[in-house]
Amino acid sequence: MSSKPPSNTPKFSYARALASSQSNKSNSTKASENNTATAEKQAVKPSGVEPTNTSRANAQKKTESTGKITSEADTEKYNSSKSPVNKEGSVEKKSSEKSSTNNKPWRGDNTSKPSANSSAERTSSQHQKPETSSQIGKDNAAPVENVNEKSTSQETAPPVSTVPIQFGSITRNAAIPSKPKVSGNMQNKSGVSSYSSKSQSVNSSVTSNPPHTEEPVAAKPEASSTATKGPRPTTSASNTNTSPANGAPTNKPSTDINTTDPATQTTQVSASNSPALSGSSTPSNTSSRSNRQNHGNFSEKRHYDRYGNSHPSYNKYSHYQHGFNYNNSGNNRNESGHPRFRNSRRNYNNQGAYPTYMSNGRSANQSPRNNPQNVNNGSTPIQIPVSLQTPYGQVYGQPQYIVDPNMVQYGPILQPGYVPQYYPVYHQTPYTQNFPNMSRSGSQVSDQVVESPNSSTLSPRNGFAPIVKQQKKSSALKIVNPVTHTEVVVPQKNASSPNPSETNSRAETPTAAPPQISEEEASQRKDAIKLAIQQRIQEKAEAEAKRKAEEKARLEAEENAKREAEEQAKREAEEKAKREAEEKAKREAEEKAKREAEENAKREAEEKAKREAEEKAKREAEEKAKREAEEKAKREAEEKAKREAEEKAKREAEEKAKREAEENAKREAEEKAKREAEENAKREAEEKVKRETEENAKRKAEEEGKREADKNPEIKSSAPLASSEANVDTSKQTNATEPEVVDKTKVEKLKASEGKSTSSLSSPSHSTSSKRDLLSGLESLSLKTNPKSEQCLESLLNSQFITDFSALVYPSTIKPPSTEEALKAGKYEYDVPFLLQFQSVYTDKPMKGWDERMKETVASAFSDKSSRGMYSSSRQSSRSGSNTHSHAGPGFGGPSERKGISRLGIDRGFSSSGAGFGSGSNYKSAPSRGVSHHGHGGMSGSHRGSQRGSRRGGGERDKPDPSSLTIPVDQVAPLQLSANRWQPKKLTEKPAETKGEDEEALLPPEVVQRKVKGSLNKMTLEKFDKISDQILEIAMQSRKENDGRTLKQVIQLTFEKATDEPNFSNMYARFARKMMDSIDDSIRDEGVLDKNNQPVRGGLLFRKYLLSRCQEDFERGWKANLPSGKAGEAEIMSDEYYVAAAIKRRGLGLVRFIGELFKLSMLSEKIMHECIKRLLGNVTDPEEEEIESLCRLLMTVGVNIDATEKGHAAMDVYVLRMETITKIPNLPSRIKFMLMDVMDSRKNGWAVKNEVEKGPKTIAEIHEEAERKKALAESQRPSSGRMHGRDMNRGDSRMGGRGSNPPFSSSDWSNNKDGYARLGQGIRGLKSGTQGSHGPTSLSSMLKGGSVSRTPSRQNSALRREQSVRAPPSNVAVTSANSFELLEEHDHDNDGGQKDSNSKTSS
């Protein structure tokens, strides 16, 4: 795992690298010389030990100290090892054979020989005297060449301390490396990192160790050789060899031993490179030259053959990174003893530049267990030169790519404190048992360029131990030393070694063998080493305990301080957070309050401004309306005053004229009555005298006339006329001058004329007859004519007879009549042009009521004329009756009457066509006189003949006309006006006095009630706008009210009308919407306030009134128990039934009215859902009224609710509940089918089946609907008029005698217009006077030679009857026998033929 290097890393430079290399060479040379001199001066001699054995004792002590330091990690490695070590000998043998090929050892081999004595001594001196250890390190730093020379001069190679190392399934012993100590005061002046140089020096001392996990073994060779036979001890006293490197006693001084003995030098180097337990920092640097030599002497091929792909670069991306070594010595620690981490590019340990080998197939060795695990000791990772680093991301075995030298290259690093997984960490206890050296030649150890960890010299720092495998605990008996209380390990014999000869031969060099040490010296040396080791161990344990106690106390203090600081910081943070939260909440509350206050103020200001604007606009509107109303009222008042003045004047004039007329009439009536009374008295006296005189004169005249008539008949006729014409002028003058004595002079003139006529006429009979005629005419005229007519007649009586008409002279303006044409057959007739000349002069009617008489005469003439073409007329009846009588005997009372009437269908045809025979006529006809006068049949006589006979033959006179008995117009008195007579209110009621000149009077509630109710009754879709405007004008009266009384009254009347007429709910809902939109905002109710305590105004007030009324009635509900079946027949006619029916009608009307209001957006959808939920609340035992109201409401608003998404989901729920209701067992069928109709209507898109549900229609819509129905009926009419083989027009005796005509339908009149038109043509044809028989049309058509077929309609039969009447057959002999018998026989034959034809058609 790598981390990104710091950004301030200096860029690579070849010049700087060259200067650094040269500086390292010079520094290494100087450091070697200084270290040699310092080591000779400051050699430490342990007390109580012989001079010859000083170096050995020191070395042993150092070795024991080093073993103590590394014993914990090594023991853990040994215990964790699970692989056997029986192949150790073979591995070592193999290694020795490979290394024996080199006659000359590698330059760096001597640095890898372990020396525990120098390490232990160095460690001990570091604990006791830090300044001394620095000097000792200088003394021990000897050149490598010196060490090699000394080692070759010895005869016998000393045994080397080994440690078992496991390579997968192979275990071998590896020598414990050591390296001479170099000066720690050397400064890094070359620009190469001190960490890199330190790690290089350490790695150079352990190049013989392979990069695998090291395993500790027993101290003695015997233990290692017998390891396969029994379990290994879990703890050991020491891991180092106690004998010198050459294995023989030496009498050289300690300084020589320190400087020349390779084992001592390597031990000292190892001790110097081991981490200080006391936390002190001792810088230790090696030269760059030795590093370059170590890199140059790396045996690449031998390393590859021995370890395979176990190099860290081969497992570059593994989680278990290896090949790194951390050096905690030198300047890597600060003043407090803690590791110092440097953020420099040179501080990163990059992989060495390995050659690109191809894979050899040994992939099994690449597992994490076969790779060495480095202990993270907390120091900064080690970095090698950039020129030797492998490019980051380069895979082993692949060709290298060229890297820019100016590019910063970094390798993967291990963070401090990193402990890999899967391998637990265990601590070892030190052991003191010495082991004989198993020396090997320096040539047998392979060099490595990559620094590997030195397990013998490096110890974990900050409590970290090497990662080793856990070994099985040994069950061998332990031997404890009573003095040191440590375990004693029995040393093994050299003969027990697997191959001692090979082991010794490994250490052999081309030089002479070293001298052998006697047993006494060996035992002495061993005792000395033991004492030194025990002392050192004790001191080390005390120091370690003290250090641990101090460290623990320090750590505890730091932890306590840190914990207190954290707690304090936490409390402060909590308090701060709490305080901030409180401040924030307070601030937010203040801001919210402030914002709300601002919003309220703003809202109030806006509302105030809006209210002011509304009030201002309202005031302006009111003022404007007031001005307009004032102007209008003023104009109306002026017009009204003017009109009233005119009416008053007119009325006064009429009254005055009427009074005057009444007075005049009264006066004239009085005078007339008085005059009539006088005249009556006088007339009675004169009449009495007149009667006597007339009787006498009459007798005489009759006698004379009779005689004269016998003599000259011409004089009889001409004399009266001549005398009358001669007396015309004199009668006029007399009438003009003496109008009052007309009756008195009448008799005198009559007598005078009589005398004249007697003297002038030669024949007395002629004069007598003429007198008699004149008197009789006078008598009749005086009784029936008015006074003016009587005057004319009197003048006629006074006129003279004209004897010669040609002698008469007429005025120039008058054209005389034609005398030649006038004198014919003894008569004189005036032509019409001559008489028309006097039209303008003679304007008097002949008698009273002349116009009425003439109207009656003309009307009777027209009625007689029109009745000629009708079957109901008396003239036609008499005419047809006479004809029928001649054929069929007297009337229809004969034996064939039943057959004729039943077969002809006269009872049906005549009654339907308006004939006089039937009583059930469908059409009104002219009054028939003939039938009423002449009784049954009406055919025995002629009404016209009887009427003429009565008039001409002096029959019974008609009763006198009632109009002639009434008093004249002049004598009619006006009606007296009663006091309590009816008069229009406009005339009777005086205009109400206004409160002021500008104010109009308010209509009282009863007037509003009457006017609004009348307007609502007259409201239709065509008059909707006009009538609604009138009602709105009345409702606007509430502007002058504070409680909206008039508006409430209008709403109440509208609501009652809408609920009482459910079919017109749509129209009344539209009217309510118009009122809400058009109502004035000035209308208010001070008793109804809104949420701001302001009176509700305008349309909102109207909506509130209306909805409150709807809600009140809807919540109260309705329930009407209507009677059903026979049990309720008595109740149907009762008053309670009608009341209940009205309640039910209004309840359903209310529901529909509410739905119509919702459709016009006056009610919200939420209110509709609440209503539906209320009606669907009970699904177990619902009321009939609720279900019926629900169905009516859903049929009204269902389509609107179902159109929205939310409403559709709610409607699904409603339908489910309705289905639940339909499944109730005892539910009435009416309610069930009603619910099913609603559900079916929803499935069909809310289609409405009932026409009533669709609402009112205009007249145009009704006409269009009628036309559509007519077209549909015509399209559905059958092409043939036959019905089951029988005539639809004719009756049949076998079908009840009434005929088989189908009943009339609603479209008969429209469908039969053409038939009635043809019937009218037939009637007009009858006026021509043609006569025909009443026989059947089939007979007539048959007689004419046509086919006997039944017609499909009555109109066609009437047309045939008309044709038969017009053209009677001439070739058929009419006999006195009944012609209907022939029809009967023909019908029997035709019925059979028709049946045969029907059977053929059906087959």
From Swiss-Prot:
Please tell me the species this chain comes from: Schizosaccharomyces pombe (strain 972 / ATCC 24843) (Fission yeast)
Q: Where is the composition biased (Low complexity)?
A: 190-208, 231-248, 270-291, 325-334, 757-768, 868-886
State the Gene Ontology terms under molecular function.
mRNA binding; structural molecule activity; translation initiation factor activity
What compartments host this protein?
Cytoplasm, Perinuclear region
As stated in the Swiss-Prot or TrEMBL entry, residues carrying the post-translational modification Phosphothreonine are 884
Chain positions with Phosphoserine modification: 83, 452, 455-456, 459, 866, 882, 886, 911, 919, 921, 1333
Which regions are flagged for Basic and acidic residues bias? Answer: 298-308, 537-714, 741-754, 986-995, 1284-1295, 1383-1403
Key word RNA-binding present: yes
The family assignment reads: Belongs to the eukaryotic initiation factor 4G family.
List the biased-composition ranges (Polar residues).
1-11, 19-39, 50-60, 109-137, 249-269, 346-381, 439-460, 493-508, 720-737, 1302-1313, 1328-1341, 1348-1358
Q: Which residue intervals make up region (Disordered)?
A: 1-381, 439-464, 488-774, 861-1003, 1266-1403
Tell me which UniProt keywords the record has, alphabetically: Cytoplasm, Initiation factor, Phosphoprotein, Protein biosynthesis, RNA-binding
A GO-annotated cellular component: perinuclear region of cytoplasm
Task: Name a biological process GO annotation.
Answer: translational initiation
Q: Which domain of life is it from?
A: Eukaryota
Concerning Pfam families, the annotation shows: eIF_4G1, MIF4G
Where is this protein chiefly located?
Answer: cytoplasm
Sites bearing Phosphotyrosine, chain numbering: 923
Q: What does this protein do?
A: Component of the protein complex eIF4F, which is involved in the recognition of the mRNA cap, ATP-dependent unwinding of 5'-terminal secondary structure and recruitment of mRNA to the ribosome.
Protein name (Swiss-Prot/TrEMBL): Eukaryotic translation initiation factor 4 gamma
Q: Domain named MIF4G: which ranges?
A: 1009-1245
